[in-house]
Amino acid sequence: MNTEPSSAGPEPASLQRIALSLQYDGSSFCGWQRQRNGRSVQAVLEDAIAQLDPHRPVQTFAAGRTDAGVHAAGQVVHFDCSGPIPARKWAPALNGRLPSTIRVRESVARPLDWHACYSATYRRYRYTIHNGRRPNLFLSPWSWHCYQHRLDESRMRDALSSMLGLHDFSAFMKAGSRRAHARTTVQEVLVERQGDLLRVEIQASGFLYGMVRLLMAQLVAVGEHRLSVAAFEQRWRERRRHEVKEAAPAAGLCLLRAGYAKPIFTKAGWYDSQPWFFLAESDPPTDPPSTPG
């Protein structure tokens, strides 16, 4: 990616920094980050920005680098531009050039020293599990259909709560991470059931590569009584990465939002105001009797 300033571009004083609140369906992309082989959210977004500001090389920065198949309801992205478009007009202008799988909810101006990634104080992810006996076509793109039996959300809540605070989470870091260490602060956790849907939310100062999907597979083992709460805690505290062998599917994971010292957007994320629990119904205790005739 060319990051050198264009000699034909405007003076730096004319730059404005734009922050976007972004949603996307991760199943359509190979992840956030631009890649040589594959369609990334970053590449598609940068191409759309370039159409509106063709005189300056485009480079975007995101609060979280979601992996292939992972969704976002409140991704935060920034870029610098030199054109005459007012900050608030970038959202509708980009939506007219982006595929339907990416939507910009809001666009605002930010100071040039503000950064979507480095200024963030937390990121919050949600993982959704469909814990019903029968698969649901409308939920499958957004959740993990997981049913051996009803998951014990109380045990899952106890296990997840053990992670609160600043710790080394090497056990939940995929190989290939560029981080110098595996320490991060888990600030809040939530495990909540409504009908056949379980939502698990984790808020942290930052997340390791593959962290949420690795720990979710372990958490489901706790909910299925295949792994004790104590064993779950022992695995991550003692950094037993070799015992964490599976990752939960990407479809259930969504970057809910990123937070900053002061709110920068006026509209709440879609997941905050309109959770889609209504899409699933609880399984009945038994199948209804067949009707004669």
Curated annotation (Swiss-Prot):
Q: How does it assemble?
A: Homodimer.
Known function: Formation of pseudouridine at positions 38, 39 and 40 in the anticodon stem and loop of transfer RNAs.
State the gene name recorded for this protein.
truA
What EC number(s) does its UniProt record assign?
A: 5.4.99.12
Molecular function terms in GO for this entry? RNA binding; tRNA pseudouridine(38-40) synthase activity
Domain of life, per the record? Bacteria
Active site (record annotation): 67 (nucleophile)
Q: Which PANTHER family match?
A: PSEUDOURIDYLATE SYNTHASE (PTHR11142), TRNA PSEUDOURIDINE SYNTHASE-LIKE 1 (PTHR11142:SF0)
Which biological process terms from the Gene Ontology are attached to this UniProt entry? tRNA pseudouridine synthesis
Tell me the first and last residues of the signal peptide.
none
- Positions annotated to bind substrate: 125
The record ties this protein, via SUPFAM superfamilies, to: Pseudouridine synthase
Q: Which reaction does it catalyse?
A: uridine(38/39/40) in tRNA = pseudouridine(38/39/40) in tRNA
Name the enzyme group at the top EC level: isomerase
The similarity annotation says: Belongs to the tRNA pseudouridine synthase TruA family.
**Official protein name in the record:** tRNA pseudouridine synthase A
Keyword terms: Isomerase, tRNA processing
Question: InterPro entries per the record?
Answer: PsdUridine_synth_cat_dom_sf, PsdUridine_synth_TruA, PsdUridine_synth_TruA_a/b_dom, PsdUridine_synth_TruA_C, TruA/RsuA/RluB/E/F_N
